[in-house]
């Protein structure tokens, strides 16, 4: 299978303003409606903040966010954390986020899609990955899960969000674009085929401690709160 995540999101960014002339920030078009979570951007941001940020992140934390889009969740994270590392495979997404947030308390890092090189060991207290793994193939998710623990310190809290193809809304999403992703090729912005059982197997195999599994807040998807292992 060939997936060019980087080019897919660069192309998305190029066409974004034309496709969403009413919006100021890229990423604000993702309001959670198709996922069954919300009906407006404000409602979706409130859900993310109250359910997945406020309970786990405080003013002493450095947060590593993998997959930042246009900085929507990064802006929410900055309300709670001390420092934020914004890591993304797309230069355009990094630029859009920097324009939105500036550089105070924020570091920006271009990812290669395989490693987390450029992030020093034991740099962050929390890893936050929301609206990103929904696009990643299972093997790519597993790969990141093997790389994250070395970058964390302290309680090593992780918030991971992925799609569940077997949920009712996940299946609707699958039926929407399956025929555009054939012959071993898939657009990097499409949703992957992923399930909660696969993610649980990944986490358990790698010795992550599962704290909470949430399949209610975002009915199409699944969000895991877990603690990364010391060593993989």
Model regions and ranges:
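Short catalytic micro-motifs in class I SAM-dependent methyltransferases
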Residues: 131-132
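A conserved beta-strand element that flanks and buttresses the S-adenosyl-L-methionine
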Residues: 128
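Class I (Rossmann-like) S-adenosyl-L-methionine-dependent methyltransferase catalytic domain
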Residues: 1-60, 66-120, 136-143, 147, ...
């Amino acid at each position: 299978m060939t997936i060019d995540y980087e080019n897919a999101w660069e192309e998305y960014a190029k066409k974004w303003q034309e496709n969403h002339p009413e919006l100021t920030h890229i990423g604000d078009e993702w309001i959670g409606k198709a996922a069954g979570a919300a009906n407006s951007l404000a409602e979706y941001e409130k859900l993310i903040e109250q359910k997945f940020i406020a309970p786990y992140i405080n003013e002493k934390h450095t947060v590593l966010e993998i997959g930042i889009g246009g900085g929507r969740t990064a802006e929410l994270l900055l309300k709670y954390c001390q420092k934020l590392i914004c890591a993304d495979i797309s230069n355009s997404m990094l630029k859009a986020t920097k324009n939105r947030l500036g550089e105070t308390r924020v570091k920006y890092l271009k990812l290669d899609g395989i490693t987390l090189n450029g992030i020093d060991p034991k740099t962050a207290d929390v890893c936050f990955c929301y609206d990103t793994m929904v696009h990643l193939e299972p093997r790519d998710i597993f790969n990141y899960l093997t790389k994250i623990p070395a970058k964390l310190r302290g309680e090593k809290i992780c918030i991971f969000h992925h799609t569940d193809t077997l949920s009712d809304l996940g299946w609707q999403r699958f039926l929407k674009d399956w025929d555009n992703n054939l012959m071993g090729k898939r657009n990097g912005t499409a949703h992957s085929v992923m399930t909660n059982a696969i993610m649980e197997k990944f986490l358990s195999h790698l010795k992550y401690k599962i704290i909470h599994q949430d399949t209610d807040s975002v009915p199409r998807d699944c969000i895991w709160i877990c603690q990364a292992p010391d060593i993989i």
